[in-house]
Amino acid sequence: LRMNFFKHIFLGFIFTAITLTVNNYVFAQETDVSSRQIDEIIVTSRKTEENIQDVPIAVYAVDEKALDDFRPTTMRDLDSLAPNLQVGMNTASGNQGAIFVRGCGYAEVEKTQNPPVGLIVDGLFLGTNTGTLLDAFDWSKIQVNSGPQGVVYGKNTSCGNVVVERNKPSKDFEVDTEVSIGNYEAYELGLILNIPINDKVSSRWNFRKLAHQGYYDNLFTEQDSGQLDIAAASARFLIEATENTEIYIVTDYYYDRGDTAPVSYSGNPFGAGCVPNFGAGLGLVGAADNGCTPGLGAVTATELSTAGAAIGITPFAAFAGLEPFFSQTEALPPHVVNLDNPEQSDMDFIRGSIEIVSDTLIGEVTIATSYLQLDDNVLQDFDATPGIAGGQGNPATLGGPLHTARNQHFSQFSQEIRVSNDITDKLNLTTGIFLWKDSIMLQQHSGGVVQTSGQDTESVAIFALVKYDVTDD
């Protein structure tokens, strides 16, 4: 027994040694490969091109090869791609992102606030989270900078930002296509044309189309719901004006004709045939044995009717005998909805920008001018029930419809002038001025009431960034 014991101990040591040796070898190989990949990643977290290992802030970058392997379809697919990055969709609009970094972000629909996680595409900061779920086509790099970033990158980006860079035009002729199909009548079409115009001017043209019929079954319309219908076109020009000056022009057009995220009814929490006690202020108390969910103070539809009839409130009096109208207590199955109002999310998005970079006697001068215009029209059924026509109502709205319609117009203009200069071999100074102007107009249609509001914003920022290398390495 003792010999067998020592034999097992000896074999265990040998097995452990072999395992550690193999693991160390594999780890060393992976480390070498990882190091080579990291060395090749250049980021612009401080407005200058630097190796990611030399940047003293929390930054995560994904290069073109990794993007090709990952194959994201839209910005939504980047959810959790980087540590502490969440990319969700706002349910009140089909193309409205809810981007969070380290748990900090903005998930509301209003454009009166700039999102604290900025999205920057080819140098253009998007001043709203509408339209941020862009198609992920011809991307060359994604960079996630943890916040705060408002001083150097973006407006009010206290939580951080996501920087997207697309491939710039090159001097080589290139044609690239992409076609894919799937279930639910899903398809993706993509076309890339890189056309050199002459020795100094190159152009790159993109077209992208994404669509599917929707993953939800609508019981009321007997049709599919939640469809996707997005198209995007881009033309980019790179001009080598002189040996020291480069001009980059970007134009984009996006449109979205899909559906908003369908709202599914989760059942009547007050109990079958019961509604909230909207007559509590009138002294209404439901019977103890009325069958409603205890602790919620709910009453039956007839009890609410009795209270209304007693004091002559006609809307309450009309609920007599309507218990079957509020009888559904179970949630609908997954991917099943029962909506009587169209789900619509229309968006038109145009942008144009020009960036001039020139090496001068005072350093590298960058002049960036951009304009963006966005129009969207969103219809949504928030009560998630078909109402009288479908024989089922939402007790929270007393069976009435809660349908919203939002027409919004947003435009922004920005101008940035930046100078980066190496004062010495170790000291770099970047200074600049950023001008911003945006305009918002909103019309809200709910319950037959039209509300119109607007806001204009102008702001100016002056910034400076000093970088000093303490050591030679």
Language-model features: locations:
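Outer-membrane beta-barrel translocator/receptor signature
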Residues: 114-116, 128, 137-146, 151-218, ...
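Transmembrane beta-barrel outer-membrane domains
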Residues: 36, 92, 132, 155, ...
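Transmembrane beta-barrel strands of outer-membrane/channel proteins
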Residues: 177-181, 205-211, 249-253, 369-371, ...
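Transmembrane beta-barrel domains of outer membrane proteins
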Residues: 78, 145, 165, 178, ...
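Acidic, small-polar-rich N-terminal luminal/periplasmic segments of exported/outer-membrane proteins
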Residues: 36-172
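Outer-membrane beta-barrel domain signature, strongest for Gram-negative TonB-dependent receptors
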Residues: 222, 228-429, 438
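N-terminal Sec signal peptide and the immediately downstream disordered periplasmic leader
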Residues: 1-70, 76-80, 194, 243, ...
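Short coil turns and loop connectors of transmembrane beta-barrels in diderm outer membranes
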Residues: 24, 171, 199-200, 211, ...
